Amino acid sequence: MIWYMRANCKQLQPPIMPRPDLAKLGINYRRIPVLSIGQDVYLDTRLIIQKLEQLEVSNPKLGADGPERKAIEKLLEIFAVDGGIFSRAAQLLPSDLPMLKDPAFGKDRIDFNNGRRWSRDDWTVVKPEAINEIRNAMEFLETTLLADGRDWILKTDQPSLADIEGVWPLHWIAGIPGALPPDQVSAERFPKVYAWINRFQKAVSAAKKSQPKPLDISGDKARELILNSGYSDPDGQVDPSDPLTRAHNLKRGEPVTVWPTDTGSSHRDVGLLVSLDGKEVVYETQPDTSPKQGVRVHAPRHGFRISHADRVSSLKL
């Protein structure tokens, strides 16, 4: 993701909660990465990619042109995330990985999964299902989009955003030794998919070498840079015709609570509503330590829930 962002600087966060650097900005949302462009902070990888594609930069854009290509790109995004490929891939992590033996990591995963604990019996059911889903995903790509031997999904000269959307969960899990049983999922069974994964890895490695390395900075330095940069996005509006606006009589400047609806939903942000439309909600945080030094957080509407801050406790969702 850092390669795709072409970030000027980065501040690595711990793999488990807490993340005090984000908390100081008033952000309780627990999934990473997040992207800051000035004092605007973007949540969720899909929204981050959309924002980066909108920027006017010298580097060529990776997004598709034309309605048919854009449709393939979008469908691959849905395929990987909403279609369950990533979540199924995560269920195939080998149990002997050091991080999975760490009690702190195990406790954090329970929190991430909204309190659900997985028993040994659960895994005997889940793992065969997950193998089948990944095998089916590989077969789908092998026999359709990659069937004619093309290098890249959209027949481009280099990987496009469509390739990124489709390859990343498979690239991730295929690179973990012992995750995929070779009699079910392998380069022998799916040669075109594995060749695509290998091409993608080579392209990423080459891109990393050709780009300036982002500067590593401390959390305090990141916060200073963010708060002194000003906002990069223009002010939006709360769409009065949006069904959510009508249902809850939402108004700009009112406190709202925003949280993801799938995982990590116990970590909820509270902020003042700045704008809302069918694609995105923007709210301004007010950190406990310094209420006037917040940021404007952008979250996608898809996969997130928004409510008046004083009504959240009554929601059983």
Show which residues each predicted segment covers.
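Non-transmembrane alpha-helical segments in soluble domains
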Residues: 49-53, 74-77, 138, 142, ...
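Short secondary-structure junctions and interdomain/linker hinges
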Residues: 80-84, 96, 148, 200-208, ...
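Short, basic/polar, glycine-containing "phosphate-handling" surface segments that engage DNA
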Residues: 124-126, 236-252
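A short, terminal or domain-edge coil/loop segment
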Residues: 63-76, 118-120, 204-219
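Catalytic cores of secreted or luminal carbohydrate-active enzymes
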Residues: 182-242
